[in-house]
Amino acid sequence: MTAPFVLLAPLRAGEADAARAAIAALDEPFARVPGTHLARIQVLRPPPRRFRGTTNDYLLLAADHDGPAESWLAVAARELDAVLAHCAFWPGAADQAEVVRWARAREVRVGFSVVGAPHATVEDVGEALALRRFLSRFAAETAGFDDDALHAAWLAR
């Protein structure tokens, strides 16, 4: 089952540009985190508030993933360590328990997922897309076949 995870972590003062540069240097990090349906990471600057002084920049990490958040976070943290290192109190990616503790303390509970098939795993979706490609190709190759030829082509696949 797909689960959302949203994290909003304050960046250390003056590190927003470095965090943006670290994000820009990433090479599809979520492709290396198994079970990730979709994910986004970016630096946010909240609107200024009157009489509140300076406004901190934040790192937003939003993802829909398969399985327990703890195991997903452990792998994602290793891929994103160069970015997360700009966050206040980041413990580093080496200790999974500390990563989970840190992330859970900054988690924003959203209660919904934007994935179209929330009960399907990434693997299920991949298999369904492969089947769709196969059936589309088969339909194109057999267009105009009579019943017997179509049946024979199906059995020969």
Model-predicted regions and their roles:
Residues D81-D95:
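Conserved short beta-strand edge segments in small beta-sheet-based binding/regulatory domains
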Residues D27-F30, E79-A85:
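A common structural junction motif
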Residues A74-R78:
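"Short basic amphipathic alpha-helical interaction patches in structured regions
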Residues M1-Y58, A63-S71, Q96-R157:
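Short S/T/G/P-rich N-terminal loop/turn motif that feeds into the first structured element of a domain
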